[in-house]
Structure formats: C-alpha cells, structure tokens
Amino acid sequence: MAGPGYEKSVMVALLPTTRDWTHLALPHLTLVYVGEIDAVRPTLYNELAKDAMTAADSFGNLDIPVVGVDEFGGGDQPTVDALRLVPTTQLLALRRIFDRYNGSQWAEFDPHVTVGPVGSATVVPDTILFDRISVCWGKEMVSYLFRQPDR
C-alpha cells in the first residue's frame, strides 16, 4: 500500500477496478487493519491469506454505492478527502470474516476509500466496483480475485 507507515502495517483490503477518482497509486478500502508487523506473529500471514482466499471464492465482485466526500485524518495523520461508502450487507458479511483480526483503535467499521489531499475529490463516482481482496504485509501483498460469474 502507498503512504507513510504502510510499510510496517498488516491489513486486509479490497482493491477497486478503476482509479480515475483517486490520486493514490494504489487505492483501497481497508477491510481490517491488523496491526504493525513487529506486533503480530509471523504465522498470521498464512491465516489471513487462507481467509482471504476463502472469501474470494465465496463472494462475487462488490459494487458499493458512494454516499459522498468526507475528510479523514487529523492529529498526527494528514487530513485527506475520502469517499464514504454504503456499508452494504455483502460488505459487512465480508468484514465479519476478518473482525477477529482487528487491531485498529477504531472499533466501528467505517467503509471509505481515500482520494488524496483535502480538496482533491473532484470526481465522485456513484459506485466503486471492487474485484479483489488483498492481504498486505508491509510492502508485500497477495491478492485474490473474487468469484466471477459463469459466462
């Protein structure tokens, strides 16, 4: 993942199919922040990857409605524009799979994707389509495509 601090972080994220609405090199929806690499046991990577693979086989693409633009951050974090997303039934079910890994200081799941610095949200799509789930372990990332419909 791009951004300061991510090189030491462990998370599970959803990756979108388009990037025209963001200024980030690798836009994502953080499904669960697990913690810092040094604070989690190394074997957790295998557990996260297994759960992500199972989730990818169980879920199809997620087309999630955008509610609007909001500002996130502050304190020791830069303030950014983010697209707030509807917590759909499918998204919440996917999040529940990974709840036990939550190492975030925020207990509530607040689905959003970062656009860039404040004032940079010039394109606001109606929905964002996510077709992959990724396990991010610092600079390492493994991604799985969601189940695709038979053609």
Each language-model region and where it sits:
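Histidine-dependent nucleotide/RNA phosphoesterase domain, centered on the 2H-phosphoesterase fold
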Residues: M1-R151
